[in-house]
Curated annotation (Swiss-Prot):
It comes from the Bacteria. InterPro entries: AraC_XylS_family_regulators (IPR050204), ExsA-like_N (IPR054015), Homeodomain-like_sf (IPR009057), HTH-like (IPR037923), HTH_AraC (IPR018060), HTH_AraC-typ_CS (IPR018062), Tscrpt_reg_AraC-type_HTH (IPR020449). Residues 184-205, 232-255 bind DNA. Keywords: Activator, DNA-binding, Plasmid, Transcription, Transcription regulation, Virulence. It comes from Yersinia pestis. PANTHER family: ARAC SUBFAMILY, HTH-TYPE TRANSCRIPTIONAL ACTIVATOR RHAS-RELATED. It holds the Pfam family HTH_18. One of its GO terms (biological process) is regulation of DNA-templated transcription. One of its GO terms (molecular function) is sequence-specific DNA binding. This is Thermoregulatory protein LcrF. Residues 167-265 form the HTH araC/xylS-type domain. The gene is lcrF. Transcriptional activator of the thermally regulated virulent yopE gene. LcrF activity could be modulated by the interaction with an inducer molecule serving as a temperature messenger. The availability of the messenger would in turn be controlled by a temperature-responsive process serving as a cellular thermometer.
Length: 271
């Protein structure tokens, strides 16, 4: 079974920053408030919420001045495949949801989930315990989520994760979203006809290819803007925008301010 490296995090981010994930996993918000954005949608988490997210890039901001404390539980594909196979008979009792899985799912932590998390944290503090105990606690947590009120949506997301064409598309798009290709070129390079490519894309991401590419580029530009000294015109070109004015319009629509204002806010908050 895959090794799982669970990490306790502390974030202080009053403005949106980009967080990239190469694998799927769970966040448990132990303290504070935090907002996640994906494809223009905002997901607000309060203390005691749990978040399941698929691999990808997200904009994140803490809602309080105090640090947000989170527990990150990665869920590698091999671990999830073993989990689904091991408990397949039991999970088959849960109804299926055939809609496109959402990139993010928020769970309220019930008393039984809270107890499961406490047990997991207790094991993490013991270096003398074998790693299999951690894996068993995570399996327990996944089963509780599967049998929660959002269990059908959660299982639908898990079942899609093992789909090889979908995994290949995710890898392909992360490697090529900055390419200045037409959509037909993306489809051809991926090895599909345009119609089939669009259908697969909708199944994986739930939005159109153009909308996803635009969102991914604006997040990349946002990261360059806040973490470097490149000029705004150079950032626009680097992120694949046809002009600085188009980039500024897109950025304002996405974040509610211009790139220049965002950079000034970053300077003011960090000193």
């Amino acid at each position: 079974m895959a090794s799982l490296e669970i990490i306790k995090l502390e974030w202080v981010t009053p403005i949106f920053k980009v967080v990239e994930h190469s694998q799927d996993g769970l966040y448990i918000l132990l303290q504070g408030q935090i907002s996640w954005q994906s494809s223009g949608q905002t997901y607000d988490l309060d203390e005691g919420n749990m978040l399941f997210l698929r691999r990808g890039s997200y904009a994140v901001r803490c809602g309080t001045k105090e640090p947000c404390q989170l527990l990150w539980i990665p869920l590698p594909g091999s671990f999830l495949s073993t989990f689904l196979h091991r408990f397949g008979s039991l999970l088959s009792e849960i109804g299926r949801d055939n809609s496109t899985p959402k990139p993010l799912l928020i769970f309220n932590i019930s008393p039984i989930l809270s107890q499961s998390i406490q047990n997991l944290c207790a094991i993490l503090e013991r270096s003398d315990f074998p790693s299999v105990l951690t894996q068993l606690r995570i399996e327990e947590l996944l089963l509780l989520l599967a049998f929660s009120s959002q269990g059908t949506l959660f299982l639908s997301a898990l079942r899609h994760l093992g789909n090889r064409p979908e995994e290949r598309l995710q890898k392909f798009m992360e490697e090529n979203y900055l390419q200045g290709w037409k959509l037909s070129k993306f489809a051809r390079e991926f090895g599909m006809g345009l119609t089939t490519f669009k259908e697969l894309f909708g199944t994986v991401y739930g939005i159109s290819p153009r909308a996803w590419i635009s969102e991914r580029r604006i997040l990349y530009a946002h990261q360059l803007l806040l973490n470097g000294k490149m000029s705004i015109v150079d950032i626009a070109m680097e992120a694949g925008f046809s002009s600085q004015s188009y980039f500024t319009q897109s950025y304002r629509r996405r974040f509610g301010c211009t790139p220049s204002q965002a950079r000034l806010t970053k300077i003011a908050t960090t000193g």
